[in-house]
């Protein structure tokens, strides 16, 4: 991929030493277009989960930034991600959200593509093309790199991007808290149910930074905390093992990732959290104790939320989920949410978690409505000529020491905004860097 040319300097918009972020980066359409080239065309993006395409020919239509892509498994069980556009006339070759096929056929002129991307069907190949068309050069456009990490599928359009595990860095430990089994085994998750999708009139960065480390906004969820939405039905959204734990925020400014987790100070016995359903309670009690046995002191780290830069966020507690904030304009975001369960969990457990997810998350869930209202009104209030003259304040924790809690990242127990500042540090670097070589 050719070096990228930046359109506009953004350093004056992100003044990290003073904790100031310009409102322009959330509302300016020119900056949004610059993001498509500088960020979404270069970074690693979450596409889907391998459990969505278990059989040869299975496909799931996803997005990478603004681009529609096809996640599919070919006849040899190899996973691919292709741009969802015909190489002849540009029409989408797959118009369904998911399914199974042997050939992706363009409905415009009929070109057909195998599930490995090869162009295998061209109407009037002999009569019109005189067999001169080199079909080997006109297959579907495939991503430059693809990675399967514990069942999650990631891709990038940039061949020069670092390998995925290097891109993820030590954020891996925190991402594992949502992907690993509840009993401490590595991986083992699967997607349950369909994908929640909805549109929000706000910039994608509001949602991404919120999950990266905003522990300051819980006042927004006060009503949810008092109505008994938690798994125990006793008022809090937290499960009980987190009640006596230290809340730790971890930032990775050089990478842009951020996470908030709980760190138990000592081994804590399991306390009931699913008392309304004895079989589910027994399952999670067993998982909790097995996790302590397998991981030892490592089991004291309990995941909460995080963001892998730029747009993949997760919730590691119930309802355990992955969210992606697809950009649709400077003032428009399409949110997608996947819900995860342990693949070998009993069906009754999966059913209970599915119902809890519907009550908790998405545009009809109790907590997501609070978040969307904040992001939407912040976007609306930042568009005016006068409003744009005044930056947002991200000073919290600025200049204070960061204690070492024995876990990766720049950490603090305080409610602070170092995670958000780290997110925007990486955003500004990518917006101006001509290539990955400069960023390494």
For each of these PLM feature ranges, what is it?
Residues 40-44, 91, 216:
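Generic structural signal for secondary-structure transition and capping sites
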Residues 1-12, 438-440:
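Basic/polar N-terminal segments that are highly enriched at the extreme N-terminus
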Residues 53-159, 163-173:
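Rieske [2Fe-2S] iron-sulfur-binding domain
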Residues 144-147, 152-440:
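C-terminal catalytic domain of Rieske-type non-heme iron oxygenases
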Residues 24-25, 29-40, 44-64:
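Glycine/alanine-rich phosphate-binding loops at beta-alpha junctions
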Residues 42-54, 124-130, 303-309:
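Short Pro/Gly-enriched beta-strand edge/turn motifs at strand-loop
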